[in-house]
Amino acid sequence: MSYRRELEKYRDLDEDEILGGLTEEELRTLENELDELDPDNALLPAGLRQKDQTTKAPTGPFRREELLDHLEKQAKEFKDREDLVPYTGEKRGKVWVPKQKPMDPVLESVTLEPELEEALANASDAELCDIAAILGMHTLMSNQQYYQALGSSSIVNKEGLNSVIKPTQYKPVPDEEPNATDVEETLERIKNNDPKLEEVNLNNIRNIPIPTLKAYAEALKENSYVKKFSIVGTRSNDPVAFALAEMLKVNKVLKTLNVESNFISGAGILRLVEALPYNTSLVELKIDNQSQPLGNKVEMEIVSMLEKNATLLKFGYHFTQQGPRLRASNAMMNNNDLVRKRRLADLTGPIIPKCRSGV
């Protein structure tokens, strides 16, 4: 308590007033003591770490004109360094001659028969439109002449002109229909273990509450028929991923799980992958395109878990680094190779698989 009372005396002191009352000698002493406390000046801004070096006494009077005259005289007295190879004035190489630009050919004036010249000179805009349509020369007349002739409604051949500017008619493409899955009804069917329900697709249904998605995960623990479960673009987050991870530890029927395009972080994705050793039925897992990147550490842990799993055949995620990407690809290739060997063993006999490296 006595130490705190001593500090109370210095609480209301004005540091600027104290520094302003110090002499130059006292300021230098204070600066030296601060240098001992902080030799690298890490507590000072970068612009204040260098000591003041402009307080030196001048060595003599400064006269600008005399200094310039001295520098000019010194520059004139200094001899230039002689060239190692003296310049003889000999010219080498070819003299550069600019290339002549090619002359544009002059178009000769076309002379028509007097009857044609007279006919064209006296032709109206509508007749010029007909001639342009027949010859296919639609630049023969300006737009103003064309629209004036079109307004006079005296053009005979309108198809030849209109067919050039007619736009291409594209077939209208309808928007994708919204997902018509009844969320509550599907949840009840999962809870009732409906044998006809083998695929649950809740993709792009954005108004599903988080407790409802967690209820889906709880219902899938006891379900024996659902093989595909997809919740792409449903705004699912980490609590949903944690519930799905607990479901994977119990469920023995689900084969495909798709949680792409959601708000699951690296912790949620890692919980899903850590549940794979407890599940022997899942063959496809898609986790790509989340709201935030997983990071290199999470990717390395995911690859380590994939290398220890022998049942997963497809893993949907684009690794950012080449090392984890190659390791995950090799793990999936080895798992598919094991499935192929088991299938051949059922047909021809047992085949002893090779040991997987790094497992």
UniProtKB/Swiss-Prot annotation:
GO terms for molecular function: actin binding; tropomyosin binding. It comes from the Eukaryota. Its main location: cytoplasm. Residues 39-138 are annotated as: Tropomyosin-binding. It holds the Pfam family Tropomodulin. It is found in: Cytoplasm, Cytoskeleton. GO terms for cellular component: actin filament; COP9 signalosome; cortical cytoskeleton; cytoskeleton; membrane; myofibril; sarcomere; striated muscle thin filament. Keywords: Actin-binding, Cytoplasm, Cytoskeleton. Binds to the N-terminus of tropomyosin and to actin. Interacts with FLII. Blocks the elongation and depolymerization of the actin filaments at the pointed end. The Tmod/TM complex contributes to the formation of the short actin protofilament, which in turn defines the geometry of the membrane skeleton. May play an important role in regulating the organization of actin filaments by preferentially binding to a specific tropomyosin isoform at its N-terminus. This is Tropomodulin-1. It comes from Bos taurus (Bovine). The gene is TMOD1.
